[in-house]
């Protein structure tokens, strides 16, 4: 199997994770979903703040998952349905074992 055929789930939040996500897409890797933090109010006006990774995923037209809880059954079912080969994590939350172990080749 060619590395670019792998079904990759990308997990991250800040700007420097966005750079890596964009590079993977630019290089032709198959990102089947992006997992990032839920939108949250920030600042004086409590305007909704979207993570840099979410903004990048939207710009690239990638599917998004934004679970409140990483052990949520709905999220886990959605992740399983993607049948990921590989998970790439850059500056994201601590992953529960069930998420960490889901991709058949592992999560890095």
What are these language model-derived features?
Residues 1-108:
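One-carbon transfer enzymes
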């Amino acid at each position: 199997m060619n590395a670019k055929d792998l079904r990759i789930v990308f997990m991250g939040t800040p700007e420097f994770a966005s750079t890596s996500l964009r590079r993977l897409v630019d290089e032709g890797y198959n990102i089947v979903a992006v997992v990032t933090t839920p939108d949250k109010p920030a600042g004086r006006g409590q305007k909704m703040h979207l993570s840099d990774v979410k903004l990048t995923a939207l710009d690239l037209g990638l599917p998004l998952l934004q679970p409140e809880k990483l052990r949520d059954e709905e999220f886990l079912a959605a992740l399983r349905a993607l049948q990921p080969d590989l998970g790439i994590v850059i500056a994201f939350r601590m992953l529960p074992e069930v998420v960490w172990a889901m991709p058949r080749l592992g999560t890095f």
